[in-house]
């Protein structure tokens, strides 16, 4: 049984309602009868800016509530916006507020393919959609006569994407201004930074607002994440078309840009100017590497598994092997991550950190000791030959525990599976 039912009246010829109340009443009565008891959200979607003239009379898009409609409409929420993108996004917000995922869309057959194309852009696999034909008669007209669309062309899809992108760009930033944390250790020939959770448009509580990763298991669609990324690129000054994220696998695999890209990897290195590379983080450490002498850079994603596997030094070694970097020239900055105050592991997993150095573990004799992955990363980098003064892990902003600061950072430990993601990024200026 659907948790939400949407009725698409977006193509409604509203001046013809005077002659079509019975058709509309029949549809709404059927929905109310079959779904009102169990569905938590009944919605009519329509357009607020379509108007046209007939017999010299101009009509606007307000659903009339005479002839028995008034009482019935009390069961439905009417969402009326100037565009399909705005309407569906508003409906998505209402669905997400109620944490619903099973949705029935009752839509005229000639609009079904178009509706599916918009939904594919604005929703993720978290949602389960089913479609039902809205039976309409064009003679005497409840709906505008139009050609049934069976396939969306590439040009039409781009038009849909442009409409959505234009709408998303108009949305205000949430939770304050966009904030980028930088390090004085990284020379000015690089663009770099670490994002926080403020200044984006994501509205899901655990993803709000500057989420930078979309997953089939989360409610933030790619188009929203891409808009957040566009705003970051404008603020930081990099080219969003040349942006690459790590494909995390909690390993020590490194992609050397220019070679064949692996299916998954937890580090990237490059010496290409104008290319921005990024490591994800939401408790795991996003690490940025820079060599101002050889003009090369890298990023790594270090969770507790990747830390023990040596992903940080694997990134350093890739820079040395590929670009001729020297250990003494490479600087390393650790981005925000979970602290030992909030991160524990079972004792059998904690033993590996204790064997690396006892200072990496607190309360070792407990069933779930506290782990300091930042300290472990520094120790491994120093053991690998990186100069201690070339490692920054204690910057006042960068050293904040992601789990302890919900106003600033996303956290898997704190927020559970539907967590948001921040990044560390770097590029060589063109």
From Swiss-Prot:
List the GO terms this entry assigns under cellular component, sorted alphabetically.
endoplasmic reticulum; nucleus; peroxisome
Q: Where does Zn(2+) bind?
A: 250, 284, 301
Q: Tissue range of expression?
A: Ubiquitously expressed, with higher expression levels in immune-related tissues such as lymph nodes and spleen. Expressed in both intestinal and peripheral myeloid-derived cells.
- List UniProt keywords, sorted A-Z: Acetylation, Cytoplasm, Endoplasmic reticulum, Hydrolase, Immunity, Inflammatory response, Innate immunity, Metal-binding, Nucleus, Peroxisome, Phosphoprotein, Transferase, Zinc
GO MF terms, alphabetically ordered? adenosine deaminase activity; copper ion binding; guanosine phosphorylase activity; purine-nucleoside phosphorylase activity; S-methyl-5-thioadenosine phosphorylase activity
UniProt-listed SUPFAM superfamilies: CNF1/YfiH-like putative cysteine hydrolases
Name the Enzyme Commission number(s) assigned to this protein. Answer: 2.4.2.1, 3.5.4.4, 2.4.2.28
Q: What reactions does this protein catalyze?
A: adenosine + phosphate = alpha-D-ribose 1-phosphate + adenine; inosine + phosphate = alpha-D-ribose 1-phosphate + hypoxanthine; guanosine + phosphate = alpha-D-ribose 1-phosphate + guanine; S-methyl-5'-thioadenosine + phosphate = 5-(methylsulfanyl)-alpha-D-ribose 1-phosphate + adenine
Induction of expression: Up-regulated by phorbol 12-myristate 13-acetate (PMA). Down-regulated by PPAR ligands. Up-regulated upon pattern recognition receptor (PRR) stimulation.
Q: How this protein is processed and modified after translation, per its record?
A: Phosphorylated on tyrosine residues.
Give the top-rank taxon of the lineage listed in the UniProt record for this protein. Answer: Eukaryota
Q: What is the effect of changing residue 265 to A?
A: Does not affect ability to promote pattern recognition receptor (PRR)-induced cytokines in macrophages
Q: Which residues carry this modification: N6-acetyllysine?
A: 247
Q: Which InterPro entries match?
A: Cu_polyphenol_OxRdtase, Cu_polyphenol_OxRdtase_sf, Cytotoxic_necrot_fac-like_cat
Q: Name one GO biological process term.
A: inflammatory response
The record's subcellular location field reads: Cytoplasm; Nucleus; Endoplasmic reticulum; Peroxisome
Key word Metal-binding present in the record?
Answer: yes
Per UniProt, what does mutating residue 254 to V do? Answer: May influence susceptibility to juvenile rheumatoid arthritis; increased adenosine deaminase activity and decreased adenosine phosphorylase activity; reduced ability to promote pattern recognition receptor (PRR)-induced cytokines; reduced NOD2-induced signaling; does not change interaction with FASN
- Looking at the Swiss-Prot or TrEMBL record, what is one Pfam family this protein matches? Cu-oxidase_4
Oligomer and partners: Interacts with FASN. Interacts with SDHA. Interacts with ATF6, EIF2AK3 and ERN1.
**So what does this one do?**
Purine nucleoside enzyme that catalyzes the phosphorolysis of adenosine, guanosine and inosine nucleosides, yielding D-ribose 1-phosphate and the respective free bases, adenine, guanine and hypoxanthine. Also catalyzes the phosphorolysis of S-methyl-5'-thioadenosine into adenine and S-methyl-5-thio-alpha-D-ribose 1-phosphate. Also has adenosine deaminase activity. Acts as a regulator of innate immunity in macrophages by modulating the purine nucleotide metabolism, thereby regulating the metabolic function and bioenergetic state of macrophages.
Similarity-based family:
Belongs to the purine nucleoside phosphorylase YfiH/LACC1 family.
Q: What is this protein called?
A: Purine nucleoside phosphorylase LACC1
Q: Which gene encodes it?
A: LACC1
């Amino acid at each position: 049984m659907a948790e939400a039912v949407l009725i698409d009246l977006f193509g409604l010829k509203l001046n013809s309602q005077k002659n079509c109340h019975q058709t509309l009443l029949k549809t709404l009565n059927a929905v109310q009868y079959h779904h009102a008891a169990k569905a938590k959200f009944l919605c009519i979607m329509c357009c607020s800016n379509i108007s046209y003239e007939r017999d010299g009379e101009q009509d606007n898009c307000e659903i009339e509530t005479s002839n028995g409609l008034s009482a019935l409409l009390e069961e439905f929420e009417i969402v009326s916006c100037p565009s399909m993108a705005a309407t569906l996004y508003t409906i998505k917000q209402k669905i997400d507020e109620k944490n619903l995922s099973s949705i029935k869309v009752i839509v005229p057959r000639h609009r079904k393919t178009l509706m599916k194309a918009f939904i594919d852009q604005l929703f993720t696999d978290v949602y389960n959609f089913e479609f039902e034909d809205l039976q309409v008669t064009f003679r005497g007209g409840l709906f505008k006569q139009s050609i049934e669309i069976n396939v969306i062309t590439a040009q039409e899809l781009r038009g849909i994407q442009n409409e959505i992108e234009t709408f998303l760009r108009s949305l205000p930033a949430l939770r304050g201004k966009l904030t980028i944390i930088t390090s004085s250790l990284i020379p000015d020939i690089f663009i770099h930074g670490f994002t926080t959770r403020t200044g984006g448009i994501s509205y899901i509580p655990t993803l709000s607002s500057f989420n930078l990763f979309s997953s089939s298991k989360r409610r933030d669609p790619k188009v929203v994440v891409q808009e957040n990324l566009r705003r970051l690129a404008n603020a930081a000054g990099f080219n969003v078309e040349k942006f690459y994220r790590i494909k995390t696998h909690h390993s020590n695999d490194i992609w050397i840009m220019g070679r064949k890209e692996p299916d998954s990897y937890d580090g990237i290195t490059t010496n290409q100017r104008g290319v921005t590379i990024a490591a994800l983080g939401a408790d795991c450490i996003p690490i940025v590497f820079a060599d101002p002498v050889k003009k090369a850079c890298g990023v790594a994603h270090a969770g507790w598994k990747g830390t023990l596997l040596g992903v940080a030094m694997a990134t350093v070694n890739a820079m040395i092997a590929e670009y001729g970097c020297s250990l003494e020239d490479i600087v390393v900055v650790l981005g925000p991550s979970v602290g030992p105050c909030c991160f524990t592991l079972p004792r059998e997993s904690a033993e590996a950190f204790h064997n690396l150095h006892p200072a990496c573990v607190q309360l070792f004799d407990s069933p779930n000791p506290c782990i300091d992955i930042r300290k472990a990363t520094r120790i491994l980098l120093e053991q690998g030959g990186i100069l201690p003064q070339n490692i920054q892990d204690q910057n006042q902003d960068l050293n904040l525990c992601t789990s302890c600061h919900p106003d600033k950072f996303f956290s898997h430990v704190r927020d559970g599976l539907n967590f948001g993601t921040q990044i560390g990024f770097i590029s060589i200026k063109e």
